[in-house]
Amino acid sequence: MKIIAYAVRDDERPFFDTWMKENPDVEVKLVPELLTEDNVDLAKGFDGADVYQQKDYTAEVLNKLADEGVKNISLRNVGVDNLDVPTVKARGLNISNVPAYSPNAIAELSVTQLMQLLRQTPMFNKKLAKQDFRWAPDIAKELNTMTVGVIGTGRIGRAAIDIFKGFGAKVIGYDVYRNAELEKEGMYVDTLDELYAQADVITLHVPALKDNYHMLNADAFSKMKDGAYILNFARGTLIDSEDLIKALDSGKVAGAALVTYEYETKIFNKDLEGQTIDDKVFMNLFNRDNVLITPHTAFYTETAVHNMVHVSMNSNKQFIETGKADTQVKFD
Protein backbone atom coordinates (compact mmCIF):
# COMPACT_ATOMS: atom_id res chain seq x y z
CA MET A 1 0.00 0.00 0.00
CA LYS A 2 1.53 3.31 -1.12
CA ILE A 3 0.45 6.94 -0.62
CA ILE A 4 2.19 10.02 -2.00
CA ALA A 5 1.67 13.32 -0.16
CA TYR A 6 2.13 16.61 -2.02
CA ALA A 7 2.76 20.14 -0.71
CA VAL A 8 4.12 18.85 2.59
CA ARG A 9 5.35 21.74 4.71
CA ASP A 10 8.17 21.40 7.22
CA ASP A 11 5.75 21.90 10.10
CA GLU A 12 3.65 18.97 8.84
CA ARG A 13 6.52 16.48 8.67
CA PRO A 14 6.52 15.54 12.39
CA PHE A 15 2.83 14.65 12.12
CA PHE A 16 3.44 12.59 8.97
CA ASP A 17 6.29 10.85 10.79
CA THR A 18 3.96 9.97 13.66
CA TRP A 19 1.31 8.65 11.26
CA MET A 20 3.87 6.53 9.41
CA LYS A 21 5.06 4.98 12.68
CA GLU A 22 1.45 4.13 13.52
CA ASN A 23 0.90 2.67 10.04
CA PRO A 24 4.06 0.71 9.16
CA ASP A 25 2.16 -1.23 6.49
CA VAL A 26 1.87 1.91 4.34
CA GLU A 27 4.75 3.26 2.23
CA VAL A 28 4.59 7.06 2.18
CA LYS A 29 6.48 9.50 -0.07
CA LEU A 30 6.54 13.17 0.97
CA VAL A 31 6.82 15.82 -1.74
CA PRO A 32 7.25 19.48 -0.71
CA GLU A 33 5.94 20.93 -3.98
CA LEU A 34 2.30 21.50 -4.92
CA LEU A 35 0.64 18.94 -7.18
CA THR A 36 1.07 20.14 -10.78
CA GLU A 37 1.26 18.76 -14.30
CA ASP A 38 5.04 18.86 -13.95
CA ASN A 39 5.24 16.48 -10.99
CA VAL A 40 2.07 14.41 -11.24
CA ASP A 41 4.15 11.60 -12.75
CA LEU A 42 5.71 11.09 -9.30
CA ALA A 43 2.41 9.48 -8.32
CA LYS A 44 2.89 6.58 -10.72
CA GLY A 45 2.73 3.31 -8.82
CA PHE A 46 1.00 4.81 -5.80
CA ASP A 47 -2.48 3.86 -4.59
CA GLY A 48 -3.44 7.28 -3.26
CA ALA A 49 -2.47 10.95 -3.19
CA ASP A 50 -2.75 13.23 -0.16
CA VAL A 51 -2.84 16.91 -1.09
CA TYR A 52 -3.28 20.46 0.18
CA GLN A 53 -3.39 23.70 -1.80
CA GLN A 54 -5.52 26.75 -2.57
CA LYS A 55 -4.51 26.54 -6.23
CA ASP A 56 -7.02 24.80 -8.51
CA TYR A 57 -6.85 21.08 -9.13
CA THR A 58 -7.34 21.37 -12.88
CA ALA A 59 -8.86 18.84 -15.23
CA GLU A 60 -5.40 18.29 -16.72
CA VAL A 61 -3.83 17.45 -13.36
CA LEU A 62 -6.70 15.21 -12.26
CA ASN A 63 -6.75 13.37 -15.58
CA LYS A 64 -3.01 12.75 -15.41
CA LEU A 65 -3.34 11.55 -11.83
CA ALA A 66 -6.03 9.10 -12.92
CA ASP A 67 -3.90 8.03 -15.90
CA GLU A 68 -1.14 7.14 -13.43
CA GLY A 69 -3.64 4.84 -11.71
CA VAL A 70 -4.32 7.04 -8.69
CA LYS A 71 -8.04 7.17 -7.96
CA ASN A 72 -7.92 7.96 -4.23
CA ILE A 73 -7.33 11.60 -3.31
CA SER A 74 -7.45 12.89 0.26
CA LEU A 75 -7.48 16.63 0.88
CA ARG A 76 -5.83 17.94 4.04
CA ASN A 77 -8.42 20.72 4.27
CA VAL A 78 -12.18 21.34 4.22
CA GLY A 79 -12.87 23.14 0.94
CA VAL A 80 -13.43 21.28 -2.31
CA ASP A 81 -14.31 24.33 -4.41
CA ASN A 82 -10.93 24.22 -6.21
CA LEU A 83 -11.55 20.74 -7.63
CA ASP A 84 -12.64 20.30 -11.24
CA VAL A 85 -15.77 18.35 -10.31
CA PRO A 86 -16.74 17.18 -13.83
CA THR A 87 -13.35 15.48 -14.11
CA VAL A 88 -13.69 13.98 -10.63
CA LYS A 89 -17.00 12.43 -11.68
CA ALA A 90 -15.88 11.37 -15.15
CA ARG A 91 -12.77 9.61 -13.86
CA GLY A 92 -14.46 8.05 -10.84
CA LEU A 93 -12.07 9.63 -8.37
CA ASN A 94 -12.59 9.07 -4.65
CA ILE A 95 -12.30 12.36 -2.77
CA SER A 96 -12.13 12.94 0.98
CA ASN A 97 -11.58 16.07 3.04
CA VAL A 98 -11.03 16.99 6.68
CA PRO A 99 -14.37 18.54 7.60
CA ALA A 100 -13.47 19.52 11.16
CA TYR A 101 -9.74 19.67 11.75
CA SER A 102 -10.24 22.27 14.48
CA PRO A 103 -13.35 24.45 14.55
CA ASN A 104 -12.07 26.01 17.76
CA ALA A 105 -8.86 27.22 16.12
CA ILE A 106 -10.79 29.30 13.60
CA ALA A 107 -13.48 30.42 16.01
CA GLU A 108 -10.93 31.52 18.62
CA LEU A 109 -9.00 33.69 16.17
CA SER A 110 -12.17 35.32 14.84
CA VAL A 111 -13.11 36.44 18.35
CA THR A 112 -9.51 37.43 19.14
CA GLN A 113 -9.34 39.71 16.11
CA LEU A 114 -12.71 41.24 16.87
CA MET A 115 -11.57 42.02 20.41
CA GLN A 116 -8.50 43.78 19.02
CA LEU A 117 -10.75 45.96 16.88
CA LEU A 118 -13.19 46.71 19.69
CA ARG A 119 -10.43 47.53 22.18
CA GLN A 120 -8.61 49.73 19.64
CA THR A 121 -5.44 47.65 20.01
CA PRO A 122 -4.04 48.56 16.55
CA MET A 123 -4.46 52.27 17.31
CA PHE A 124 -2.78 51.99 20.72
CA ASN A 125 0.08 49.96 19.26
CA LYS A 126 0.61 52.68 16.68
CA LYS A 127 0.59 55.41 19.34
CA LEU A 128 2.84 53.49 21.72
CA ALA A 129 5.42 53.02 18.96
CA LYS A 130 5.68 56.84 18.96
CA GLN A 131 5.71 57.02 22.79
CA ASP A 132 2.25 58.55 22.77
CA PHE A 133 0.63 57.24 25.95
CA ARG A 134 -2.64 59.19 25.80
CA TRP A 135 -5.99 57.40 25.89
CA ALA A 136 -8.25 59.66 23.83
CA PRO A 137 -9.78 59.52 21.35
CA ASP A 138 -9.51 55.72 21.06
CA ILE A 139 -12.23 54.67 23.46
CA ALA A 140 -13.21 50.99 23.28
CA LYS A 141 -16.47 49.08 22.99
CA GLU A 142 -17.55 46.06 25.02
CA LEU A 143 -18.62 42.88 23.29
CA ASN A 144 -21.23 42.16 25.94
CA THR A 145 -23.22 45.19 24.72
CA MET A 146 -23.36 43.97 21.12
CA THR A 147 -25.37 41.68 18.88
CA VAL A 148 -23.29 39.25 16.83
CA GLY A 149 -24.75 37.86 13.61
CA VAL A 150 -23.28 34.48 12.67
CA ILE A 151 -23.77 33.47 9.03
CA GLY A 152 -23.20 29.73 8.85
CA THR A 153 -23.84 27.69 11.99
CA GLY A 154 -21.92 24.54 11.17
CA ARG A 155 -19.01 23.28 13.24
CA ILE A 156 -16.98 26.49 13.09
CA GLY A 157 -19.94 28.81 13.40
CA ARG A 158 -21.22 26.86 16.38
CA ALA A 159 -17.82 27.05 18.10
CA ALA A 160 -17.79 30.82 17.51
CA ILE A 161 -21.30 31.13 18.93
CA ASP A 162 -20.24 29.46 22.17
CA ILE A 163 -17.29 31.84 22.55
CA PHE A 164 -19.33 34.95 21.76
CA LYS A 165 -21.92 33.87 24.32
CA GLY A 166 -19.15 33.45 26.86
CA PHE A 167 -18.40 37.15 26.47
CA GLY A 168 -22.05 37.96 27.13
CA ALA A 169 -22.94 39.01 23.59
CA LYS A 170 -26.38 38.46 22.13
CA VAL A 171 -26.01 36.06 19.20
CA ILE A 172 -28.30 35.60 16.22
CA GLY A 173 -27.72 33.21 13.35
CA TYR A 174 -28.63 32.49 9.76
CA ASP A 175 -28.16 29.22 7.92
CA VAL A 176 -30.00 27.48 5.12
CA TYR A 177 -29.52 24.25 7.08
CA ARG A 178 -30.49 24.98 10.65
CA ASN A 179 -29.05 23.35 13.74
CA ALA A 180 -31.95 21.81 15.69
CA GLU A 181 -30.50 22.72 19.07
CA LEU A 182 -29.90 26.35 18.10
CA GLU A 183 -33.37 26.55 16.60
CA LYS A 184 -34.88 25.47 19.92
CA GLU A 185 -33.04 28.37 21.51
CA GLY A 186 -34.70 30.76 19.05
CA MET A 187 -31.37 31.99 17.75
CA TYR A 188 -32.16 32.05 14.03
CA VAL A 189 -33.50 34.90 11.94
CA ASP A 190 -35.38 34.07 8.76
CA THR A 191 -33.47 36.25 6.31
CA LEU A 192 -30.04 37.76 5.85
CA ASP A 193 -31.66 41.19 5.69
CA GLU A 194 -32.92 40.69 9.25
CA LEU A 195 -29.45 39.73 10.39
CA TYR A 196 -27.87 42.72 8.66
CA ALA A 197 -30.36 45.08 10.31
CA GLN A 198 -29.87 43.72 13.83
CA ALA A 199 -26.18 42.80 14.08
CA ASP A 200 -23.37 45.02 15.32
CA VAL A 201 -20.91 42.32 14.27
CA ILE A 202 -21.28 40.04 11.25
CA THR A 203 -19.09 36.95 11.02
CA LEU A 204 -18.93 34.60 8.04
CA HIS A 205 -18.53 30.84 8.43
CA VAL A 206 -19.90 29.42 5.18
CA PRO A 207 -18.29 27.61 2.21
CA ALA A 208 -17.74 29.35 -1.12
CA LEU A 209 -20.58 28.59 -3.52
CA LYS A 210 -21.85 30.17 -6.72
CA ASP A 211 -24.92 31.36 -4.85
CA ASN A 212 -22.96 33.30 -2.22
CA TYR A 213 -20.26 34.87 -4.40
CA HIS A 214 -19.78 38.46 -3.10
CA MET A 215 -22.70 38.00 -0.71
CA LEU A 216 -21.36 40.99 1.22
CA ASN A 217 -21.57 43.68 -1.43
CA ALA A 218 -22.77 47.28 -1.63
CA ASP A 219 -26.40 46.20 -1.30
CA ALA A 220 -25.70 44.08 1.79
CA PHE A 221 -23.59 46.80 3.43
CA SER A 222 -26.37 49.34 2.87
CA LYS A 223 -28.73 47.21 4.97
CA MET A 224 -26.38 47.01 7.96
CA LYS A 225 -26.20 49.18 11.03
CA ASP A 226 -23.83 52.12 10.81
CA GLY A 227 -20.48 51.17 12.29
CA ALA A 228 -20.84 47.42 11.87
CA TYR A 229 -17.83 45.10 12.19
CA ILE A 230 -17.15 42.44 9.55
CA LEU A 231 -15.31 39.17 10.19
CA ASN A 232 -14.46 36.85 7.31
CA PHE A 233 -12.92 33.59 8.47
CA ALA A 234 -14.34 31.53 5.63
CA ARG A 235 -13.64 32.26 1.95
CA GLY A 236 -12.36 35.39 0.22
CA THR A 237 -14.99 35.32 -2.52
CA LEU A 238 -17.76 35.96 0.01
CA ILE A 239 -16.89 39.67 0.12
CA ASP A 240 -16.70 42.22 -2.68
CA SER A 241 -13.47 43.84 -1.51
CA GLU A 242 -14.00 47.09 -3.42
CA ASP A 243 -17.45 47.49 -1.89
CA LEU A 244 -15.95 46.79 1.55
CA ILE A 245 -13.47 49.61 0.99
CA LYS A 246 -16.33 51.99 0.17
CA ALA A 247 -18.21 50.88 3.28
CA LEU A 248 -15.11 51.48 5.41
CA ASP A 249 -14.60 54.91 3.85
CA SER A 250 -18.20 55.92 4.58
CA GLY A 251 -18.17 54.61 8.15
CA LYS A 252 -20.91 52.10 7.42
CA VAL A 253 -18.33 49.49 8.44
CA ALA A 254 -16.23 50.44 11.48
CA GLY A 255 -13.66 47.70 11.04
CA ALA A 256 -12.95 44.33 9.50
CA ALA A 257 -10.93 41.25 10.38
CA LEU A 258 -10.03 39.13 7.37
CA VAL A 259 -8.22 35.82 7.35
CA THR A 260 -8.84 35.36 3.65
CA TYR A 261 -8.90 37.47 0.48
CA GLU A 262 -10.31 36.55 -2.91
CA TYR A 263 -6.97 36.93 -4.72
CA GLU A 264 -4.81 35.71 -1.85
CA THR A 265 -2.89 32.98 -3.69
CA LYS A 266 -0.42 35.53 -5.10
CA ILE A 267 0.26 36.96 -1.65
CA PHE A 268 -0.44 34.68 1.29
CA ASN A 269 2.18 32.24 2.58
CA LYS A 270 4.89 34.02 0.59
CA ASP A 271 7.81 36.14 1.82
CA LEU A 272 7.31 39.42 -0.04
CA GLU A 273 9.54 41.58 2.15
CA GLY A 274 10.92 44.50 0.17
CA GLN A 275 8.77 43.70 -2.85
CA THR A 276 5.97 45.76 -4.35
CA ILE A 277 2.53 44.20 -4.11
CA ASP A 278 0.64 45.28 -7.22
CA ASP A 279 -2.84 44.44 -5.89
CA LYS A 280 -4.11 47.94 -5.05
CA VAL A 281 -7.33 46.68 -3.48
CA PHE A 282 -5.44 44.40 -1.11
CA MET A 283 -2.96 47.13 -0.19
CA ASN A 284 -5.80 49.56 0.49
CA LEU A 285 -7.20 47.12 3.04
CA PHE A 286 -3.79 46.09 4.37
CA ASN A 287 -2.74 49.66 5.15
CA ARG A 288 -5.82 50.52 7.21
CA ASP A 289 -5.62 50.65 11.00
CA ASN A 290 -9.17 49.33 11.29
CA VAL A 291 -8.61 46.28 9.07
CA LEU A 292 -6.77 43.28 10.50
CA ILE A 293 -5.46 40.79 7.95
CA THR A 294 -3.97 37.42 8.80
CA PRO A 295 -2.71 35.29 5.88
CA HIS A 296 -5.15 32.38 6.03
CA THR A 297 -3.74 31.30 9.39
CA ALA A 298 -6.94 30.79 11.39
CA PHE A 299 -6.50 27.02 11.16
CA TYR A 300 -2.80 27.10 11.96
CA THR A 301 -2.48 25.40 15.34
CA GLU A 302 -0.70 22.22 16.40
CA THR A 303 -4.03 20.52 17.02
CA ALA A 304 -5.37 21.43 13.59
CA VAL A 305 -2.26 20.41 11.64
CA HIS A 306 -2.17 17.07 13.47
CA ASN A 307 -5.80 16.43 12.56
CA MET A 308 -5.33 17.53 8.94
CA VAL A 309 -2.54 15.01 8.44
CA HIS A 310 -3.96 12.11 10.42
CA VAL A 311 -7.58 12.37 9.26
CA SER A 312 -6.65 12.77 5.60
CA MET A 313 -4.14 9.92 5.63
CA ASN A 314 -6.55 7.64 7.50
CA SER A 315 -9.21 8.39 4.88
CA ASN A 316 -6.83 7.60 2.04
CA LYS A 317 -5.94 4.30 3.66
CA GLN A 318 -9.66 3.53 4.05
CA PHE A 319 -10.22 4.23 0.34
CA ILE A 320 -7.42 1.85 -0.61
CA GLU A 321 -8.64 -0.91 1.69
CA THR A 322 -12.42 -0.62 1.29
CA GLY A 323 -13.24 1.86 -1.49
CA LYS A 324 -14.96 4.10 1.08
CA ALA A 325 -13.87 6.60 3.73
CA ASP A 326 -15.44 8.20 6.78
CA THR A 327 -14.83 11.67 5.37
CA GLN A 328 -15.64 10.91 1.73
CA VAL A 329 -17.07 13.82 -0.27
CA LYS A 330 -20.00 13.01 -2.54
CA PHE A 331 -20.62 15.09 -5.67
CA ASP A 332 -24.27 14.71 -6.71
Swiss-Prot record:
Transmembrane segments: none annotated. Keywords: NAD, Oxidoreductase. One of its GO terms (molecular function) is D-lactate dehydrogenase activity. The active site is at 235, 264, 296 (proton donor). Pfam families: 2-Hacid_dh (PF00389), 2-Hacid_dh_C (PF02826). It comes from the Bacteria. It catalyses: (R)-lactate + NAD(+) = pyruvate + NADH + H(+). Its EC number is 1.1.1.28. NAD(+) binds at residues 155-156, 175, 206-207, 212, 233-235. InterPro entries: D-isomer_2_OHA_DH_cat_dom, D-isomer_DH_CS, D-isomer_DH_CS1, D-isomer_DH_NAD-bd, NAD(P)-bd_dom_sf. Also active on D-glycerate. Belongs to the D-isomer specific 2-hydroxyacid dehydrogenase family. Homodimer. PANTHER family: 2-HYDROXYACID DEHYDROGENASE HOMOLOG 1-RELATED. This is D-lactate dehydrogenase. It comes from Lactiplantibacillus pentosus (Lactobacillus pentosus).
